[in-house]
Amino acid sequence: MKTIALFSHHPECSNECTLGMITALSPHYRVRVWGIADNLDYVLSQSDCVAFPGGIGDSDSYYEFFKRRHGNAIANFVDNGGKYLGICMGQYWAGSHYFDVLKGIDVVQYIKQPDAEIKRSYGTVAKVTMDYGSWKNMFFYDGGVIVPNNDPPEPYKVKATYQNGMPMAIIQGNVGIIGCHPESEMFWYDLYPYIR
């Protein structure tokens, strides 16, 4: 069974997101939770994949607990065959301002796109189309979208798109990132009764 090292640091990483990922991944993977007090080199040496959940972590909080050596360690891990999984906040952290594990693409706020149907950063539901053609409603809380940056993009597979057709979930090499919350549990929706 492969090992996923799931980062957790409350409140930047939502406990609900972390627990949702553990619930979703545990039947298929060995999930080990790690935090800023752990030795990252050791964590990565024992893992097949490093994962980052959703939460409220912005650039300020990221730089409070991740130094350049941490970013380099994550990037080297991915370059040497390790996998990266990022959901919502973890999707943003794959981008050029953070771990920089994407090639020729970046992550920006979906709600800032001119044709986005969601315009505010609150809990709601996004209608997403999966790569196999069907659509589903998925929990959304200020998730990202994939856009080109100034470098030539390397190929990536679009696994799901937002209602406006922009990529919501992709796989590029060893990196898988998701803007919405497929790990969401039913009680999340109880916190936002207006989306029922």
Task: Outline where the language-model segments fall.
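Aromatic-Pro/Gly-enriched surface loop or interdomain linker
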Residues: 1-47
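Hydrophobic/aromatic beta-strand patches that form the interior of the parallel beta-sheet core
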Residues: 32, 85, 100, 159, ...
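Structural motif
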Residues: 49-55, 175-179
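A glycine-rich, often tryptophan-bearing local segment used as a flexible ligand/cofactor-contacting loop or short
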Residues: 57-58, 62-130
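Catalytic beta-strand/loop cores that center a nucleophilic Ser/Cys/Thr
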Residues: 119-174, 179-188
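Acyltransferase
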Residues: 187-196
